[in-house]
Amino acid sequence: MYRRLGAHQRLVLEYKFFEPAFYATDVPDWGTSYAHCVALGDRAVVCLDTGHHAPGTNIEFIVMQLLRLGKLGAFDFNSRFYADDDLIVGAADPFQLFRILFEVVRGGGYGPDSDVTFMLDQCHNIEAKIPGQIRSVLNVQEMTARALLVDRAALTDAERAGDVLGANAVLMDAFYTDVRGDLADWRVARGLPADPMAAYRASGYAERIVAERIGGAQAGWGA
């Protein structure tokens, strides 16, 4: 498969330490995925699904290592409480999402020159699917903006001095900053709605697709 990649294609290999069997028996962890990608070549990279880890896993450490090694290719963003729940990204632990995105920024994985792809891998079984996707994108945008606000020089000084509380204060200052107004201005400057959720609700699209949908109910696990 790798040998048959086109000139503008790459192979992105995800991992998971439990079900289904083709994950757990072949690519159970990020190290195995990394080893496969190194063996394949430069166009093979690791995909990190934020829900594919044991409770308590230091995901931001994995992000940092894969960026350092030049093998982080993509994210499948979601949240989890118990297993691979595929909940809205940032819903379970927004501070973890902030820490992950800060490592992405610090490690050079964010920006026009980066090949790291941001994707969503979620199941919206209770909330409506499109608003759930909009909320997910907004969460990633907001935490990325906060990660970009971290005073990296001050953080580096605190880290080198062994000042744990000082380093924490630098991160928390950025994390607690309300960036929603700035993001609204950023969207307006690009001809986009300042409030994407409000724009979707006002569009009437949800009501229209319900009226057109066979049976009147969206498809789900019971479909």
For the regions a protein language model found, what residue spans apply to each?
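Surface-exposed cleft-lining segments at the edges of enzyme active sites
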Residues: 17-24
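Histidine-acidic metal/acid-base catalytic patches
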Residues: 2-10, 24-223
